[in-house]
Curated annotation (Swiss-Prot):
GO CC list: cytoplasm
Domain hSac2, residue spans: 68-240
Tissue-specificity statement: Expressed in the epidermal layer of the skin.
Family: Belongs to the TPRG1 family.
Alphabetic keyword roster: Cytoplasm
InterPro entries for this protein: hSac2, Inositol_phosphatase, TPRG1-like
Protein name: Tumor protein p63-regulated gene 1 protein
Native organism: Homo sapiens (Human)
Domain of life assignment: Eukaryota
Subcellular locations according to the entry: Cytoplasm
Region forming the signal peptide: none
Main localization, broad class: cytoplasm
Annotated stretches, region: Disordered: 1-54
Biased amino acid composition, Polar residues: 41-53
Length: 275
């Protein structure tokens, strides 16, 4: 009687995919009776293969869900905003960027940013209807501090985000009213927080306009020049660029949890709904 755990009498076979009727060369073990040496079993590669999951934004069917990446969409937005700046102020545009704004309630919002020689423009652009919905103008001479760093949250916060961003201050947060601080739709917040757009790696074009480093390289000199040329209260100011954690004061975070996971802040194809 053979002992328990003995594998005598068993023959190793390789797994084959369904429909493969031809035996492979490794299906049978070499069994030469005259060979005095122990039988050698060659190692076979596993039937399942482990591969690194690719960046989802490299896949066209995912990137096309974002209307900003569709052919001609970002170019149309830039031309619209160029025309608006030419008609209203005539200022010189330093560059365009497509970034994600994170509001004081941790909600993500897709935004186009323009830096001119005097102004930072934050545009809410509808990439579906190809029209500017909202435009916020911030004088560069009013910006006095920029913070770069990782996002941090209160210890009890339920909806935390990873990654890094930047925050631009043109007013004191201490002077912000309690009402505007707790109002998720308030437009009186004296700062703006940004991070890179999720479509950054879609193409070389989007890699260029979605990078925070590229945005900073144009924004900082423009602010410094605006301070030098300012004739008002901003004259003589010095811009502070700090590396420190960026605090987002959200505690429950249910609203941002639902909105961010469903990408409600982006012009996105939501799919068809039928019966």
């Amino acid at each position: 009687m053979s002992t328990i755990g003995s594998f005598e009498g068993f023959q190793a076979v390789s797994l084959k995919q369904e429909g493969d009727d031809q035996p492979s060369e490794t299906d049978h073990l070499s069994m030469e009776e005259e060979d005095p040496m122990p039988r050698q079993i060659s190692r076979q590669s596993s039937v399942t293969e482990s591969t690194l999951y690719p960046n989802p934004y490299h896949q066209p069917y995912i990137s096309r869900k974002y209307f900003a990446t569709r052919p001609g969409a970002i170019e149309t937005a830039m031309e619209d905003l160029k025309g608006h700046v030419a008609e209203t102020s005539g200022e010189t545009i330093q560059g365009f960027w497509l970034l994600t704004k994170i509001d004081h309630w941790n909600n993500e919002k897709e935004r186009i940013l323009l830096v001119t020689d005097k102004t930072l423009l934050i545009c809410k652009y509808d990439f579906i209807m190809l029209s500017c919905v909202q435009l916020q103008r911030i004088p560069l001479s009013a910006v006095y501090r920029i913070c770069l760093g990782k996002f941090t949250f209160p210890g009890m916060s339920l909806d935390k985000r990873q990654g890094e961003g930047l925050r631009i201050y043109w007013g004191s947060p201490e002077e912000q009213s309690l009402l505007s601080r707790w109002n998720p739709w308030s437009t009186e917040v004296p700062y703006a927080t940004f991070t890179e757009h999720p479509m950054k790696y879609t193409s070389e074009k989007f890699l260029e306009i979605c990078k925070l480093s590229g945005f900073m390289s144009k924004l900082v000199p423009a602010i410094q020049n605006a301070h030098k040329n300012s004739t008002g209260s901003g004259r003589g100011k010095k811009l502070m660029v700090l590396t420190e954690p960026i605090l987002i004061e959200t505690y429950t975070g249910l609203m941002s949890f639902i909105g961010n996971r469903n990408k409600l802040g982006y012009s996105l194809a939501r799919g068809s709904i039928g019966f």
